[in-house]
Amino acid sequence: MTTLTAQQIACVYAWLAQLFSRELDDEQLTQIASAQMAEWFSLLKSEPPLTAAVNGLENSIATLTVRDDARLELAADFCGLFLMTDKQAALPYASAYKQDEQEIKRLLVEAGMETSGNFNEPADHLAIYPELLSHLHFSLGEGTVPARRIDGLRQKTLTALREWLPEFAARCRQYDRFGFYAALSQLLLVLVECDYQKR
């Protein structure tokens, strides 16, 4: 990636972490279909590797906005995909994909972070990874911690996430009937791959 700043990448990661952490409320639903988000999506599409994923997300948002009771339908999608058994779902936990659930805890400790008491999910929940990556990208811009240390931790986090994110995204595509979370997971997957290649 060349045109997005570390702070812009951090914002995308933080936004994705928020959307994967809980069901969307009415305010978030209005926001994702707003003109302000359309401008943000245009900026993201200026990064060629992200263009197709952002287009897919915009299409899923357009489809979502014409659904009756969109928030309730999206809540049902969230519940069906992320909170049910793994037979026809995409569980958002590293441990569901036979990954070491302790790895993210070690990475958080190394970054001087911990999970919030307000987040009632295990530490290996998907939302924790982009939240950590957001923190690391913001830290790169601040210059208070040596860039080499931050970059090493960023690479470890990306490597850990790449172990299971492709399967998670594939399961989202397979089981997300309306496609919003499938598109969201595809954007995260492409962003992670671009970020990883930027070694």
Swiss-Prot record:
The lineage of its organism: Bacteria, Pseudomonadati, Pseudomonadota, Gammaproteobacteria, Enterobacterales. It comes from Escherichia coli O6:H1 (strain CFT073 / ATCC 700928 / UPEC). It is found in: Cytoplasm. Pfam families: Nitrate_red_del. The keyword Cytoplasm applies. One of its GO terms (cellular component) is cytoplasm. Its main location: cytoplasm. This is Chaperone protein TorD. The gene is torD. Involved in the biogenesis of TorA. Acts on TorA before the insertion of the molybdenum cofactor and, as a result, probably favors a conformation of the apoenzyme that is competent for acquiring the cofactor. PANTHER family: CHAPERONE PROTEIN TORD (PTHR34227:SF11), CHAPERONE PROTEIN YCDY (PTHR34227). The keyword DNA-binding does not apply. Belongs to the TorD/DmsD family. TorD subfamily. Keywords: Chaperone, Cytoplasm. One of its GO terms (biological process) is protein complex oligomerization. InterPro entries: Chaperone_TorD, DMSO/NO3_reduct_chaperone, HscB_C_sf, TorD-like_sf, TorD/DmsD_chaperones.
